[in-house]
Structures are given as structure tokens and as C-alpha cells.
Amino acid sequence: IGYLFTAKSGTGKSTHTNLWREFFKERAVMVNDDKPLLRVTENGVTAYGTPWNGKHRLSTNIGVPLNAICVLERSDENHIEKVTAESVYNMLVQQVYRPQNPQKLLKTLQLIDVMADNVNFYRLGCNMDISAAETAYNGMKGSI
């Protein structure tokens, strides 16, 4: 089961995923630390590792079913809530590749809509304590 974390640049995505690796040890596998490839079908979403794996060079050549997308926000206390796709739509559009060609951009937006029907969405307020990883996991695992 895969979880994808997204946020504005500098929010702490790499820091948070590092907490997952610290908390879960070898059970936490990084598919891609920067730009995973998402295959979106009517049957679900699969996340794949790619060579574009960011400054930390963390990527695994695998594909995993994507269960949830979690929007990270900084907070003094750790908390997570399930949210609607509509509430995070703007963030999703900002984070995907947006073609200049209008027809291709429309297709991208349609894929986001299909993805929204097949993936759970969460908003995580977190600090840099290892308990943030546990909070995120416990909040999202119930939606499997």
C-alpha cells in the first residue's frame, strides 16, 4: 500500500518521509522522493519509481497501489484528518505536470478527476517529531 505526501516547497516532505524511514525501518520503502509516475485508471492508481528522484536520490524501481495522498502542513501538534478531493484539488493541480497544449492539459485534469475517485485524501498537520510518522500512518491505515 502506498502513501504519497505533497506540500508546497520547503514544508518538510523529505523531513517527514525520513521520519517514516526512522519509525518503520526497512518496512518503509521510498518509491520516489521527488517525482513518481502515477498510472491512473478506472481501477485505481499505481505509483512508480522514476530516475527523477530529487536531491536525496531515493527511488525504488517498483510500482505500488496508491491508497492515499496526504497534504502536509507545519503544525506544533500532530493531527490528521480525512478531507475531500475538492479541498485539495488546487494543490494537486500545482503538483502535477501541466502541458502547454490545451487538449493535453484537459486530459491531465480529467486524470486528476479519475484519481480523485480512486484515492483517499488527508491533511496532516505535523512537527518534526518521530510521532508525526505514527500519527500519519494511524490516520491513513484505516482507509485501506
Feature annotation, model-predicted:
Residues 16-17:
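Post-Walker A alpha-helix
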Residues 13:
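Conserved lysine of the Walker
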Residues 2-6, 22-144:
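Glycine-rich, often acidic-flanked micro-motifs
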Residues 9:
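Walker A/P-loop nucleotide-binding motif
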